[in-house]
């Protein structure tokens, strides 16, 4: 958690007073304005630039003008000069137009995050009035005399106002009219004063968010990959187990000479009976076992009888004379 906080601070928080300058400058159409941005000693060797802020959602620089040490660069109506001895750079804008109004950046180019300072330019419509034309001389006039101000108070039904009447000055000096400040202008000036001296561009604010999103995405991909690997390993182990069980069953089957009790065939039955035997007339296994035991007993008895017949002595063979003599004796 601590490295993420440090990363956020490095990306978002700008350098402390590394670059200073005016927050706002103004002028009329056709005028020339200049401003001066100062920087610290360690920024002396870096390249300086002046650009206009652009973009809608993400701030970016446009119309950038770069300047190196002791170099003055002019592009169009803008010029920038870097003075490392004074630790400052000067920006001049000529022939102002209403389109020049907007926000600009006075920045220092360096590796990683740039140091920048936001400046607001306000261009008033119309040209500045010159009371004294060029090439003319004003006649000398006596010291003007002024009358003291006499405030007059006028009451209205629902409001009170103090009105001050200014006497006409008895002088031939030209009159310079200052631009009137409306409530909107006063609010704009107040808001510009209340703004901090250092502004954070949208890119710097979005960079930590993008980095965190990328880290979360990478962590999710790693977790998903590990889950898939475990699932594939389990599936492979299950397949191998099934194969091993199948091989064991095939090797443990009985041989050709092995017969079960249910598969015993009664040898005493003739082939004709087997051919004429209907499937419905096939005896049950218990009946087959009983008939088989009875037939085995009968076969054993017949074998005993055969043995006795073999062991009995053969009959005596007598000749014809002996037979006749025996017949004679018996009579």
UniProtKB/Swiss-Prot annotation:
Biased composition (Polar residues): 278-293
Residues glycosylated per entry: 136, 140, 143, 145, 150, 152, 154, 164, 181-182, 186
Ig-like V-type domain span: 19-120
Extracellular-facing ranges: 19-204
SMART domains: IG
Cysteine pairings via disulfide bonds: 37-106
Tissue: Expressed in monocyte cell lines. Expressed in certain types of endothelial and myeloid lineage cells. Expressed in mesenteric lymph nodes (LNs), spleen, thymus, lung, heart and kidney. Expressed in high endothelial venules (HEVs) in peripheral and mesenteric LNs (at protein level). Highly expressed in heart. Slightly expressed in spleen and thymus. Isoform 5 is expressed preferentially in heart. Isoform 1 is expressed predominantly in kidney and liver.
Transmembrane segments: 205-225
Membrane protein topology class: Single-pass type I membrane protein
GO annotations of cellular component type: apical plasma membrane; basolateral plasma membrane; multivesicular body membrane
Broad class of where this protein is predominantly found: membrane
GO molecular function, one term: IgM binding
One GO term of the biological process aspect: immune system process
Location of this chain's protein in the cell: Apical cell membrane; Basolateral cell membrane; Endosome, Multivesicular body membrane
Record note on modification: O-glycosylated with sialylated oligosaccharides.
Pfam families: V-set (PF07686)
Spans within the Cytoplasmic topological domain: 226-331
This protein's domain notes: Ig-like V-type domain mediates binding to lymphocyte.
Function according to Swiss-Prot or TrEMBL: Receptor which may mediate L-selectin-dependent lymphocyte rollings. Binds SELL in a calcium dependent manner. Binds lymphocyte.
Protein family: Belongs to the CD300 family.
Name listed for the protein in its UniProt record: CMRF35-like molecule 9
Originating organism: Mus musculus
Lineage of the organism: Eukaryota, Metazoa, Chordata, Craniata, Vertebrata
Gene of this entry: Cd300lg
